[in-house]
Every structure is written in structure tokens, then in C-alpha cells.
Amino acid sequence: MSKYKFNIDNYHAIGHADIEIEGITVIVGSNGCGKSTMSRWLYYIVNTLSVLDSFFFSDFRDVIIKSLEKYSTALDDISNYLDDDKKRFFDHTLSLMTMVTLSNGGVEKLDFYYKRAIGSLDDMLVNFLQKEQNPQQVRRVLNLFGITEQNHVHEDIERNSIQLFSECLQKYENNKKNRPISYLKEKIASVYREKDGFPASISFKEDEVELLVDRLGKIYSLNNAIYIGTPAAISLRQSDRVLMTSLAHKVVHVNEKGSEITGKQELLHSINKMIDGSIVEKENFDAVDLVYHSNNGKDIRIEDIASGFKPLVYMLRLIENGWLTENTLLEIDEPETNLHPQWVV
């Protein structure tokens, strides 16, 4: 495992804080000194840096999709002249574009669907122009599509679409190359709904290499962070914090791309022994409840079990579902574990 150093100065309750992470790390301090704030920002940094290229691509993809969605109102307005199959084909193509990610086809697949959508628009527009008799309506639609003359439909649509895609692609390539720290700040604010502002003095090093510089460094040995908060603040059913909804998702759902960790069965056996039971799934109408089943036969919903049990239960599920691996930073913000020394990890 790589060695990490994380520092924040003069941010809310934090005056000066330095932590080194190499294996198990315990952060100790008085109540209100900023331990949770420190942990939260470490979570933000790791989870944003580790998928930065995916963020760049999703922003690129979303701009392309929005450029096509703006025509939907016009297509509805001129629906009397549209072939229903062509309109459905266009909508289906947009739906497929929303599912394109950096890892399942990237730019090449997005370009393919984009050209298909543009071709569909071209066909529908030509069909409309052949039948529409109102010159004002014709001009209105042509203006929306950026077409100068009615007899230049194919040329203008092709030129405009190529130009837009090229400009967006260039911006995407520039972001990948430059990796601006301003982008990291914007993503943390939007994705995690963080309203307190980015710390003025913050540092994150992997093996003594600073990653939070003007051109963001790439994180090598971690691919995600998981945050287990104070039990009283956690509800697997409802939460307004992204950290908690992310945890809830991982506790409930299997990671289809997850990998086995060394000693998985031994870990699971050890945790089951500590909690003197296991976690089972029980159907509850259209949902699934996670239930603690004790070795003496009692069933208790996870939400209702003792606070000291919860971190272990969540760890158990994270391991079972394939989310907790050797490349995961697990943060447990759990004061009550101090009441149970045998459960401290």
C-alpha cells in the first residue's frame, strides 16, 4: 500500500491538522476539533481524483445530449409531419447516449450514436419541409436548427453538428490533459453538495508526491473511499447527504465489477463471530430489508440494532457485496466504538 499524507489548515474548527495514512490509522482529538470535517474532505478528494477522467467524459457526453434535446420541443410541435418510428428511433438513440461511459465505448460510441441521431433529425426535418405550407413556421424551425437556407438543410446540419462535436471534444481533451484543480473544486461542490467552500490550505500526497496542484495528479493505489458516519446520523432508507446514500447503496447492492479480497472468508467469519450472528435479506413489499439474525434466533432490522454493531455490520455487507477491496480507503467516523474496545478496527 502507498503512504498518504493529508493536511488542512485554518478551516472551520481545524487550526492545523496533518495525518499520515499507511494501513490502519486512528485520528484522535477532542470533540469539535474537526475530525469529521477532515474525514469528509479526505473522502471527497479520494473519490473525485480517482474518477476524474470519468467526470470529464460524462460532462462532455451531457453537453452533446443537451444539444440534441433542445430540438425535442420542435419535434413535438411538428409531430403531424413526423414518422412515429423515426421519432421513437431518435428518442431511443438519445436514451442510449445517456448510458455511454468512458469504460463502455467512450468517445467512439458516443460519436456513433450522435451521428445516428443527427441523421434521424435530418430525415425528419426534410419530411417536415416538404409538407409545411406556413413560411413563418418553416423559418422558425430552420432558425432553431441553425439552417441558413431551406435548400441547404443537409449541408448546414452536417456542418453544425461536426463543429459542435469537435468543439466539445476539444474541451474534453483539454480537461484530460490539463486536469485543472478548479474542476475538482467545482465537482466536489456539485456532486457532494458541499456548501462550505474549498479549504484555502489543503494538501494530499501519495508517496510524498503532491496531487493537489494546478494540474491535478493521478491517484495510483486507491480507487475509492467509503465513509461510515456516526450511527445516529445514518439511515439506510433516507438521507440528504451523498456520503450516506452512497454507503446505503453499497450496503444493499452487489458491486458487479467488484473483486475478491485476500482472506475474505476469514474476515467474514471473524465479523460474524464478533456480532454473534449474521445479516440476512428479507423482502418487505417492493423493498428488501436487511436484518440482523442473532445466533440465538432473534431478528432485528439494521436500523434498530445497537450503535456499536453498525460499523461492523456495514463492513460485513461491504465485503460480501464486493465494495471493500485492497484499494479502498475505509473511514469510520464512529465515536461509540471507543465503548467497545474489542470491536475497534
Tell where the protein language model's regions lie, with residue ranges.
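Switch/communication elements of ASCE P-loop NTPase nucleotide-binding domains
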Residues: 1-51, 291-345
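Phosphate-coordinating catalytic segments in nucleotide- and nucleic-acid-processing enzymes
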Residues: 5-7, 48-327
